[in-house]
């Protein structure tokens, strides 16, 4: 870091909670941003004119990949893909596959959900995205 950023960081460390809260409010106003935690890992930028009208449909940003069914002869291939996607151990992934219909991934982006669906279907499983 540069000397300027080091100096700012040291000054921030000395602020009380009340002062830090006031600083956040001033930064939000000065730069037109929000310090609220983004939903779904993506930050929504406000367009000109402030808040969006209530009539606009809210676009879904988080999706679930649901494993609907797996043919008996495709279980091993689907199990391997489920393990890759979830990072589960062999027993946990096997239990998930055998408990279909079951959510494989939850709260993921549309692209990731489409990719997971494609991979599981290529292995022989039936998948829906909600």
Curated annotation (Swiss-Prot):
Gene Ontology cellular component list: cytosolic large ribosomal subunit
Assigned keywords, A-Z: Ribonucleoprotein, Ribosomal protein
One MF term in the entry's GO annotations: mRNA binding
Superkingdom per UniProt: Bacteria
CDD domains according to UniProt: Ribosomal_L7_L12
Pfam family, one: Ribosomal_L12_N
Coiled-coil annotated spans: none
InterPro entries hit by this protein: Ribosomal_bL12, Ribosomal_bL12_C, Ribosomal_bL12_C/ClpS-like, Ribosomal_bL12_oligo, Ribosomal_bL12_oligo_N_sf
One of the GO BP terms on file: translation
Disulfide bonds: none
Record text on subunit structure and interactions: Homodimer. Part of the ribosomal stalk of the 50S ribosomal subunit. Forms a multimeric L10(L12)X complex, where L10 forms an elongated spine to which 2 to 4 L12 dimers bind in a sequential fashion. Binds GTP-bound translation factors.
Protein purpose: Forms part of the ribosomal stalk which helps the ribosome interact with GTP-bound translation factors. Is thus essential for accurate translation.
Sequence similarity: Belongs to the bacterial ribosomal protein bL12 family.
Listed HAMAP family: Ribosomal_bL12
UniProt name for this protein: Large ribosomal subunit protein bL12
Originating species: Nostoc punctiforme (strain ATCC 29133 / PCC 73102)
